[in-house]
Amino acid sequence: MVLIRVLANLLILQLSYAQKSPELVVGGDECNINEHRSLVAIFNSTGFFCSGTLINQEWVVTAAHCDSNNFKMKFGAHSQKVLNEDEQIRNPKEKFICPNKKNNEVLDKDIMLIKLDSSVSNSEHIAPLSLPSSPPSVGSVCRIMGWGSITPTKVTYPDVPYCANINLLDDAECKPGYPELLPEYRTLCAGIVQGGKDTCGGDSGGPLICNGQFHGIVSYGAHPCGQSLKPGIYTTVFDYNDWIKSIIAGNTAATCPP
């Protein structure tokens, strides 16, 4: 069974795959408190349900399938029980999804750009992560992070974000496990071939950081998470650089690559 990595209380789409319930990084450890300064917690009245990445003081990138009504974003968070003094909360002022996205295909152009209602300030636990300067290289060691469940089959939510190292894999290593993937979806395949480390449900929208660069957005994967031969699927950020820059520059009619 395959799920998109979102909330448990969202309705499951009756498609060839289902949306993922919120779970966290499986096979990881608690993140260092200072290593996830760009990680954004997206939440509503039910709690955290997605993550995002701060790319400058006014803009966040996440997955399009994380879009919902009445959500807020928390910056500088680590423990859900012990607040950092520099935590900041913002509302979305504007949300941008590719106008040429195929609405009936969740994997297609699974990226959303959010303008904040006011800018955030850099601090000890808050700093943006810039867009990638070049495409990622197969074999790169990549970092994943999030507040999702730390167990693959039942929901076990941690109070802190978990992190893990995985590898960027060749698309050919993903195709057998995900025959529905199409080249035009512009995705990356990353994980551990033998399984055991993976993003999961509530990690949707969070970053895949390879060699210090923001290369992917958590999008899609198998359920249970962390299966062998079924790595995670991530939206390729580099392919959307021009669209993101155009929107930020004020060209709100810009379209994404086909």
From Swiss-Prot:
Protein's cellular compartments? Secreted
Question: What's one GO BP annotation on this UniProt entry?
Answer: proteolysis
Q: Which cysteines are joined by disulfide bonds?
A: 31-163, 50-66, 98-256, 142-210, 174-189, 200-225
CDD domains reported for this sequence: Tryp_SPc
- Domain (Peptidase S1) ranges: 25-249
EC number(s) reported in the record: 3.4.21.-
Instruction: Determine if Magnesium is one of this entry's keywords.
Output: no
Q: Which SUPFAM superfamilies match?
A: Trypsin-like serine proteases
Tissue-wise expression: Expressed by the venom gland.
Q: Which UniProt keywords apply?
A: Disulfide bond, Glycoprotein, Hemostasis impairing toxin, Hydrolase, Protease, Secreted, Serine protease, Signal, Toxin, Zymogen
GO function terms (MF aspect): serine-type endopeptidase activity; toxin activity
Glycan attachment sites: 44
Q: Which residues form the active site?
A: 65, 110, 204
Q: Specify the signal sequence span.
A: 1-18
Q: Per its UniProt record, what InterPro entries does this chain match?
A: Peptidase_S1_PA (IPR009003), Peptidase_S1_PA_chymotrypsin (IPR043504), Peptidase_S1A (IPR001314), Trypsin_dom (IPR001254), TRYPSIN_HIS (IPR018114), TRYPSIN_SER (IPR033116)
According to the record's subunit comment, the protein's assembly and interactions are: Monomer.
- What is the protein's known function? Snake venom serine protease that may act in the hemostasis system of the prey.
Q: State the similarity comment.
A: Belongs to the peptidase S1 family. Snake venom subfamily.
Name recorded for this polypeptide: Snake venom serine protease PA
State the taxonomy lineage: Eukaryota, Metazoa, Chordata, Craniata, Vertebrata
